């Protein structure tokens, strides 16, 4: 990072608007980039020795990932007290909130959305990166209806032939091998989480539910769930294939992409291209130096110059003309933010600290083959799910290639290595070898609070928030800015199945 980065604070480059989310590990703010007037999300993490290693690992992962369905890193700004990670702002909300408000998706829409998620996960797995916390809260939908995966706080680099031992992620999305505390293949665990996600977006609730944590874990370990009758045969087949208890029989991400139900997303893998000199010319008109911009891009500094370039490039990639990006916005005016802070638990979870707030219920080791399993009565309007020992339903599903490679037991996860020219190498001291309190599978077990049942509708807005919302609305009217139309929420029961 440029040597002058410490001399500048966030306020010199961004106008912070309000908080999107917060937690014990950091706070995510909605902000306006002063030079380009673009809205961004800034995650502010306290600069401390226990956080440095985790932040370095996560930033290195974000640097490595460039995919249209993965959150884009713009800049890393280090101040005397905080590390500020600037990413693109996705205003459409997360899939969890969307499903809770609008109900489950129609299959055609779910095919498109799930295909994009599969494409992004495949891109990560091809680089030996596993996410480890795939869930609806960590998938945002943009204004065009496309989705992006966020929150790579638990993402790790897994060498081929490595088994992981540390438990991390969200309990309701745990694979059986994690519940049983067995060494596991990170990619196969990601695949299981994709199955939970697919079930949720097409039914509106989780496949494994129980009145207690132990009951939920027992259902996960035995693969006990039911399928609503409205689910098509191909979708049912795909869910059964993914939620296969033995990990060695579980399909790979490539197998899932080839399934006839999945709508494959054609993505041109981004390649190193020459800088857009039209963007550089625009930045020079804002006071940036062309040579510094080129050097920052070449060395991947993710400093102020590179951040401004990436922010403008993101706007151009969305179809905005070079000349209209700046000319349509007065120099001293940022876009009007939403009338009230949007509910963005997924953004707030971006790199937020995991909490070890859930007890580990010890379960007997349940062999997935042949042993008697507890009987699960089907609810009215539901199909009885196949057990882990039942053969998969054949619906032109390609044979899964057997993986004969042996796995070496690994004592822990391998963190994504920092890039040689990482922006933090010259900015932050490297602490002595120690476990950092981030939940990146290096220390004790870290899990996010799981959703055992479909949560109840949000509580009523407080008087202060209502007053704040009215003030924002009045200001919007005074500025002659039309308010965004309200979307009517549909309060559906957690057990109600859409026809």
Swiss-Prot record:
Residue positions of the active site: 133
Record keywords, A-Z: ATP-binding, Kinase, Nucleotide-binding, Serine/threonine-protein kinase, Transferase
GO molecular function, one term: ATP binding
Protein EC: 2.7.11.1
One Pfam family cited in the UniProt record for this chain: Pkinase
Enzyme class: transferase
Keyword set includes Zinc: no
Database matches in InterPro entries: Kinase-like_dom_sf, Prot_kinase_dom, Protein_kinase_ATP_BS, UBA
Catalytic activity reported: L-seryl-[protein] + ATP = O-phospho-L-seryl-[protein] + ADP + H(+); L-threonyl-[protein] + ATP = O-phospho-L-threonyl-[protein] + ADP + H(+)
Binding site for ATP: 20-28, 43
Keyword Nucleotide-binding: yes
Domain Protein kinase: 14-262
Chain ranges of the UBA domain: 274-314
Family: Belongs to the protein kinase superfamily. CAMK Ser/Thr protein kinase family. Smok subfamily.
Function of the protein: May play a role in sperm motility, especially in the regulation of flagellar function.
Entry protein name: Putative sperm motility kinase W
Record organism: Mus musculus (Mouse)
Species classification: Eukaryota, Metazoa, Chordata, Craniata, Vertebrata
């Amino acid at each position: 990072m440029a040597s002058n980065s410490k001399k500048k604070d966030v306020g010199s480059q961004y106008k912070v608007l309000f908080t999107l989310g917060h937690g014990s590990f950091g706070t995510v703010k909605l902000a306006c980039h002063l030079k380009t007037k673009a809205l961004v999300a800034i995650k502010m993490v306290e600069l401390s020795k226990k956080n440095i290693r985790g932040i370095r690992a996560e930033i290195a992962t974000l640097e490595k990932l460039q995919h249209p369905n993965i959150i884009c890193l713009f800049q890393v700004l280090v101040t005397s007290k905080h590390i500020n990670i600037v990413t693109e702002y996705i205003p459409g909300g997360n899939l969890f909130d969307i499903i809770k408000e609008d109900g489950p998706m129609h299959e055609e829409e779910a095919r498109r959305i799930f295909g994009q998620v599969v494409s992004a996960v495949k891109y990560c797995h091809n680089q030996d990166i596993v996410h480890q916390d795939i869930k609806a809260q960590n998938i945002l939908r943009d204004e065009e209806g496309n989705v992006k995966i966020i929150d790579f706080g638990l993402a790790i680099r897994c060498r081929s032939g490595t088994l992981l031992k540390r438990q991390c992620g969200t309990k309701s999305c745990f694979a059986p091998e994690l519940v049983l505390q067995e060494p596991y293949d990170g990619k196969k665990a990601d695949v299981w989480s994709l199955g939970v996600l697919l079930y949720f977006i097409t039914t509106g609730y989780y496949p494994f539910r129980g009145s207690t944590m132990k009951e939920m874990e027992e259902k996960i370990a035995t693969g006990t769930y039911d399928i609503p009758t409205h689910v098509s045969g191909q979708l049912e087949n795909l869910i059964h294939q993914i939620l296969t208890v033995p990990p060695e029989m579980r399909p790979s991400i490539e197998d899932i992409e080839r399934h006839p139900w999945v709508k494959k997303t054609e993505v041109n893998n981004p390649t190193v291209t020459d800088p857009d000199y039209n963007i550089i010319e625009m930045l020079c008109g804002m006071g940036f130096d062309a040579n510094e911009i080129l050097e920052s891009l070449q060395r991947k500094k993710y400093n102020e110059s590179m951040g401004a370039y990436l922010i403008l490039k993101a706007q151009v990639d969305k179809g905005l003309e070079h000349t209209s990006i700046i000319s349509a916005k007065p120099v001293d005016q940022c876009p009007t933010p939403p009338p009230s802070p949007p509910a963005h638990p997924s953004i707030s979870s971006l790199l937020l600290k995991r909490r070890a707030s859930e007890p580990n219920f010890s379960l007997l080791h349940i062999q997935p083959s042949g042993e008697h399993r507890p009987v699960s009565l089907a609810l009215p309007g539901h199909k009885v799910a196949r057990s882990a020992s039942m053969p998969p339903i054949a619906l032109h599903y390609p044979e899964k290639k057997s993986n004969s490679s042996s796995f070496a037991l690994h004592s822990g996860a391998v963190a994504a290595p920092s890039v040689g020219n990482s922006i933090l190498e010259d900015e932050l001291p490297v602490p002595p070898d120690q476990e950092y309190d981030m939940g990146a599978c290096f220390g004790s077990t870290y899990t996010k609070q799981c959703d055992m049942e479909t949560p109840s509708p949000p509580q009523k807005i407080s008087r202060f928030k209502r007053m704040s919302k009215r003030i924002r609305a009045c200001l919007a009217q005074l500025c002659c800015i039309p308010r965004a139309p309200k979307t009517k929420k549909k309060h559906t029961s957690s057990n109600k199945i859409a026809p």
